[in-house]
């Protein structure tokens, strides 16, 4: 990370896409996408997804590391080009507990991530706990971040410290996605970004963390990009001009969250304006969902009814029977909720792919289609971009390859934004 930031600060148009997903096909897609380049691949886990208690994935930080390393080994991706990051590391998961208890767990969270070899650590203590006022005083936020930083510094060995980096600050949206419809987005004011940096500098120095300050590479801000279930707020560079100008006077860059679904040109403009770390998550699993839905349509055309996977029906049954991951996010009317379940940009379906019934039906879908030849006309009908790539000779039409390539459509847009002189 330090090299990428240094090159950006030296004037090179360079950024990095942060892949925020625990889905094995998404991770495989990202690693295969840069397998034959010299690029680093940044893969991040969030605190609610992976923590010392297992998170909603059931993985602790060391488990997630081994999970990613296992996929890397399968595809031949070198570990030295992998960067593992932890996002929103702090009291996020324990906001309903008193601050003292939540911070105690947050310290253990940080230790677990650093001990597992995660080198990009987002210190986020911005959320109020059960006995806190709302919002928290910025100095309290910074001092809590310093406590977390001290835990990281105390856990890392000297070799790890060569690569260890920190991200501070937070964006407006809650981790995990918007729960309601958005109308507009508040762009972070440069004075607030400056205050975030100043308070963290004071707090770190109070705690004897002067050396750790040199490892702070980025500040999380809101540049004016967001999405909800049905709409996207696109980047407007003119609205963030003052914010972009301020960061130039510091040794840091910005990290932008929720950049999913922006245009290729928007990613390029964001990196130009020093939002050099672009986080993406739901757009990747949305592309995965599109690919599986497309393959299900092909299966309906090619496989006899009694042998089909029924994957779309199984997804509906599971999500309707177990609505915990989508109920409070989607519209209450049944017909509208079904549209959201299938097609929402926030892609709450991503939480259900590990479900045993859904996983088995997806496996059967792929097995069924592996046993037949996929007609080019059928691929053109349901996956036209992949049809073009087949015609160009850069893709072989297996179900697995079609899914991977569909996910990589998203990554191609980020590469355009993050890389100098790309077509």
UniProtKB/Swiss-Prot annotation:
Keywords: Galactitol metabolism. GO terms for cellular component: plasma membrane. Disulfide bonds: none annotated. Pfam families: GatZ_KbaZ-like (PF08013). Pathway: Carbohydrate metabolism; D-tagatose 6-phosphate degradation; D-glyceraldehyde 3-phosphate and glycerone phosphate from D-tagatose 6-phosphate: step 2/2. GO terms for biological process: D-tagatose 6-phosphate catabolic process; galactitol metabolic process; phosphoenolpyruvate-dependent sugar phosphotransferase system. The keyword GTP-binding does not apply. Forms a complex with GatY. PANTHER family: D-TAGATOSE-1,6-BISPHOSPHATE ALDOLASE SUBUNIT GATZ, N-ACETYLGALACTOSAMINE PERMEASE II COMPONENT-RELATED. HAMAP family: Tagatose_aldol_GatZ. Component of the tagatose-1,6-bisphosphate aldolase GatYZ that is required for full activity and stability of the Y subunit. Could have a chaperone-like function for the proper and stable folding of GatY. When expressed alone, GatZ does not show any aldolase activity. Is involved in the catabolism of galactitol. Belongs to the GatZ/KbaZ family. GatZ subfamily. This is D-tagatose-1,6-bisphosphate aldolase subunit GatZ. It comes from Salmonella typhimurium (strain LT2 / SGSC1412 / ATCC 700720). The gene is gatZ.
